[in-house]
Amino acid sequence: MNLKILGIDPGSRNCGYAIIEADKGKNILIEAGLIKIKPSTLQYQITELCEGLDLIFKNHSFDEVAIEDIFFAYNPKTVLKLAQFRGALSLKILQIHGDFAEYTPLQVKKAVTGKAKATKEQVAFMVKRLLGLSKDIKPLDITDAIAVALTHAANLRVRV
């Protein structure tokens, strides 16, 4: 069963996205990038994020969408801002695509590296290795989005 999966790593400065094709345990990276969010008012930043997501959905169709849940942060303002971005993303995905899967950062790290407390660099190393890529993927927002898509692909194989 050949599935096209969109993985998203939401952020308030950059939102990483990755498109993989998953088929019988083999995953192929189709595209990965960033939705860049310029410093501005929160309303305009959320608008930029949603417009970037619109563009991705206009250029591709997906069987599955997966998004990383927000991480715990010590700064309440940061948590609130990330929650607003994530809420806007969730609504946009529901409007365009419908249901989507959610994974915590710990679930993603565990699925990709085998360790829930892995560093971002360890995740990046394993993403590169799992996809058989020769070049490093930068920035880490993109690597995280790929990891989300890979986590969802693995989760689907377990459920099928």
UniProtKB/Swiss-Prot annotation:
GO terms for biological process: DNA recombination; DNA repair. Keywords: Cytoplasm, DNA damage, DNA recombination, DNA repair, DNA-binding, Endonuclease, Hydrolase, Magnesium, Metal-binding, Nuclease. The active site is at 9, 68, 141. It is found in: Cytoplasm. GO terms for molecular function: crossover junction DNA endonuclease activity; DNA binding; magnesium ion binding. Mg(2+) 1 binds at residues 9, 141. CDD domains: RuvC. Mg(2+) 2 binds at residue 68. Its EC number is 3.1.21.10. Binds 2 Mg(2+) ion per subunit. GO terms for cellular component: cytoplasm; Holliday junction resolvase complex. Its main location: cytoplasm. It holds the Pfam family RuvC. The keyword Cytoplasm applies. It catalyses: Endonucleolytic cleavage at a junction such as a reciprocal single-stranded crossover between two homologous DNA duplexes (Holliday junction). InterPro entries: RNaseH-like_sf, RNaseH_sf, X-over_junc_endoDNase_Mg_BS, X-over_junc_endoDNase_RuvC. NCBIfam families: ruvC. Homodimer which binds Holliday junction (HJ) DNA. The HJ becomes 2-fold symmetrical on binding to RuvC with unstacked arms; it has a different conformation from HJ DNA in complex with RuvA. In the full resolvosome a probable DNA-RuvA(4)-RuvB(12)-RuvC(2) complex forms which resolves the HJ. The RuvA-RuvB-RuvC complex processes Holliday junction (HJ) DNA during genetic recombination and DNA repair. Endonuclease that resolves HJ intermediates. Cleaves cruciform DNA by making single-stranded nicks across the HJ at symmetrical positions within the homologous arms, yielding a 5'-phosphate and a 3'-hydroxyl group; requires a central core of homology in the junction. The consensus cleavage sequence is 5'-(A/T)TT(C/G)-3'. Cleavage occurs on the 3'-side of the TT dinucleotide at the point of strand exchange. Belongs to the RuvC family. HAMAP family: RuvC (MF_00034). This is Crossover junction endodeoxyribonuclease RuvC. It comes from Campylobacter jejuni subsp. jejuni serotype O:2 (strain ATCC 700819 / NCTC 11168).
